[in-house]
Structure formats: structure tokens, C-alpha cells
């Protein structure tokens, strides 16, 4: 099991959103194993359990945000096996640097309107469409679990419902809330964590070697 601690940084008017995802293996049914023996025999698919959602109060300064995150990451489970993903777009870069100075190891995600993922210092440039696509994939393949008692669950689902795809003048899909008054901070926080987990860990675990990766496979099972 591994945790993905993801932070979508806000502004004076927008919340900073924190999400914690736990990646756990779920056994795959025999009829969903690959036919190609060269791929091995993946027996488990990755499922993401949303363990925590939080919005920080508006107006917090950067040092306070960094201390808050550092304190949360000192939790026993998170300290041992977590990845810290942070929105490094715009004003996010100074916070990323402050986290590094505080002894943390953040992975920066600079959200762009482009069409390709590219590497950058301490992270990636990632099109917003890529983030939303990764989130859509785990929902469509039923590989995400939202506990009934999860704090801010209703707000997250409201954001998700009102997120829409629009087409700009250059023909590139963009993703934004369909209602101007509805934030997208929770959705983007979760999407960044999912995207990074899927990129670095893959979709499936192999029997005997759970760190191995395999081709993308849909999982028709119901939510846990």
C-alpha cells in the first residue's frame, strides 16, 4: 500500500485543497487476465481509496501552509510510504521551494493548457486534460472508493458533476467548472494524485512482483 498526498494551491479567493489517496491492490478475476504470456500474469489491479479531503482557510500565508503539510506528513503511515504532489503552477513554485527547504520532497505539477507532458525540475508540466483524463479513467474502471463518511465528499462530488469539457478557439479541449461560483480545487487535488500514481506505478500488480507494470486493463467490478 502507498499513499499519495496531493495539494492544489489556492489564492486569496480560492481554497488550497489537500487530498490523501491510498493505493491498494484488488484481486482481478481470472477472465480479465491478459492472454499474452509475455506480459506475465497480473493478479491485482490498483484501487484508490480517498482517505482525506481538506480545504485550508482562505488567506493563509505560505509558511503556514508548508508547516501544516509537514505536520500532516509526520503521521506514522504517511511518513513511511507517501508521495507529496503539489501544484507548482504560477505562485506554487515558491511554495515548492519552501517545502524543499523544510526537508520535504515535493513533486511539482505545473498545470498547462498544452498537449504534452514534459519533465521539469522537481516535477512535470502536465496538461489539465491529462489530469482530468486520469481521474475519469479510474472512475470509469471503478477503481476508486469514496468512503461514506469522508469529509467534503458532497463538495467533491458537486465539483465533479459540474466539471465540463469545452472547446476553445484552437480546437483544444479545456476543463473547467460549468458554474463560475463552483470551485475545482478538490477535483484537481485528487486528479493530480491519481495522475502521478498511474504514471509512476502503472495500473496492475503482478503476482510475485507488485512493482511491475502492465498494459492498461479495464476493471468491470463494482466499487468496493
Model regions and ranges:
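Mobile, glycine-rich extracellular loop/lid and propeptide segments
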Residues: 135
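Glycine-rich, anion-gripping cofactor-binding loops and their flanking helix/strand elements
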Residues: 132
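Carbohydrate-associated surface elements
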Residues: 138
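RNase H-like, metal-dependent nuclease domains and their acidic two-metal-ion catalytic environment used
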Residues: 1-110, 117-119, 129, 141-224
Amino acid at each position: 500500500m502507498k499513499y499519495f498526498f496531493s495539494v492544489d494551491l489556492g489564492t486569496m479567493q480560492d481554497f488550497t485543497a489537500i487530498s490523501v489517496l491510498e493505493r491498494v491492490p484488488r484481486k482481478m478475476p481470472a477472465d480479465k487476465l491478459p492472454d499474452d504470456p509475455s506480459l506475465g500474469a497480473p493478479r491485482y489491479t490498483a484501487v484508490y481509496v480517498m482517505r482525506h479531503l481538506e480545504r485550508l482557510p482562505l488567506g493563509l500565508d505560505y509558511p503556514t501552509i508548508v508547516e501544516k503539510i509537514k505536520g500532516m506528513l509526520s503521521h506514522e503511515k504517511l511518513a513511511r510510504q507517501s508521495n507529496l504532489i503539489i501544484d507548482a503552477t504560477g505562485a506554487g513554485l515558491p511554495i515548492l521551494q519552501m517545502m524543499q527547504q523544510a526537508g520535504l520532497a515535493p513533486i511539482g505539477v505545473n498545470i498547462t493548457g498544452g498537449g504534452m507532458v514534459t519533465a521539469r525540475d522537481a516535477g512535470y508540466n502536465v496538461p489539465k486534460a491529462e489530469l482530468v483524463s486520469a481521474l475519469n479513467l479510474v472512475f470509469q474502471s471503478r477503481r476508486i472508493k469514496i468512503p461514506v463518511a469522508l469529509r467534503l465528499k458532497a463538495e467533491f462530488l458537486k465539483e465533479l458533476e459540474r466539471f465540463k469539457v469545452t472547446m476553445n478557439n484552437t480546437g483544444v479541449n479545456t476543463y473547467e467548472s460549468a458554474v463560475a461560483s463552483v470551485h475545482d480545487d478538490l477535483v484537481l487535488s485528487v486528479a493530480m494524485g491519481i495522475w502521478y500514481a498511474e504514471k509512476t506505478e502503472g495500473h496492475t500488480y503482478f503476482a510475485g512482483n507488485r512493482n511491475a507494470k502492465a498494459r492498461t486493463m479495464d476493471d468491470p467490478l463494482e466499487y468496493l
